[in-house]
Design a protein with these regions (language model features):
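Conserved active-site alpha-helix within GNAT-family acetyltransferase domains
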Residues: 115-118, 125-152
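Conserved acetyl-CoA-binding loop-helix of GNAT-fold acetyltransferases
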Residues: 87, 92, 98-111, 123
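Active-site rim helix/loop that mediates acceptor-substrate recognition in acyltransferases
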Residues: 19-22, 26-68, 73
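A conserved beta-turn-beta hairpin within the catalytic core of GNAT-like acetyltransferases
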Residues: 73-86, 97
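Internal, conserved structured core segments that host functional sites
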Residues: 52-53, 57, 88-91, 118, ...
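Conserved glycine-rich acetyl-CoA-binding loop
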Residues: 62, 80, 93-104, 116, ...
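A short beta-loop-alpha structural element at the N-terminal edge
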Residues: 6-18
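Acidic/histidine-enriched, glycine/proline-rich intrinsically disordered or flexible terminal extensions
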Residues: 164-207
Length: 207
């Protein structure tokens, strides 16, 4: 891992490069093709989008990583609505993965979110990676994932308090922001703006 990287806020001039980066990173990972590049494209105009936490990572003048945050809520069992953040997509360029850049970008992003006074981040991820940055299973905070049947595996659903004790005494249901839900036809139309890539059905895909 080289140390001459920079992390800064995304600018409009970065949009296409970021979308290309995300497309390459997620292509055929969770589904044949991917939708994450279109998700980012639409999230930028969403009211829940946090512009102060929309980051790119550069190395040698090239954008090699990105991360973003959205505002959402926990619908608490006692009737309260608890403001929280969700995160992602987050990615690093394929040729630079597993070299430490992802954790650096993640930790920087979380520090900036905490500095804004925000209380907690909840999202879907792998505990083996995100646990190294302080995430735990959301079930440990008594927070449930929306629409997940009781007793179903929720090990993908993670949480990190940015303010210690922010979720003390709270139980409830996390809501994914609507901006993450996109129509497949819209994804297909948007994807035609990019170089053609082969969609493959591969083992381990979840969609």
């Amino acid at each position: 891992m080289e140390n001459n990287y920079t992390i800064r806020l995304e600018e409009e001039k970065d949009y296409r490069a970021v979308e290309e980066l995300v497309r390459e990173s997620f292509w055929n990972v969770y589904r044949p093709g991917c939708s994450e590049h279109y998700v980012i494209h639409t999230l930028r105009g969403d009211p829940a989008f946090v512009r102060e936490l929309d980051f790119v990572m550069e190395l040698g003048g090239r954008i090699i990583g990105q991360n973003l945050f959205m505002r959402t809520v926990i619908e608490a069992d006692d009737g309260r609505t608890i403001p929280v953040l969700t995160m992602g997509p987050i990615c690093i360029a394929n040729d630079l993965k597993r070299q430490g850049y992802g954790k650096v970008l993640l930790d920087y992003s979380l520090e900036k979110a905490a500095a804004l006074g925000l209380g907690a981040v909840l999202f879907e991820g792998n505990i083996d990676f995100y646990g190294k940055s302080g995430f735990d299973y959301a079930s440990q905070f008594d927070i449930r994932y929306h629409d997940l049947p009781e007793g179903a595996d929720s090990s993908f659903f993670l949480c990190k308090e940015l303010k210690k004790g922010y979720l003390d005494g709270i139980s409830g249901v996390y809501q994914t922001p609507q901006g993450y839900y996109v129509d497949d036809a819209d994804v297909e139309k948007f994807d035609k703006q990019f170089p053609k890539k082969e969609k493959l059905k591969l083992p381990g895909q979840i969609f």
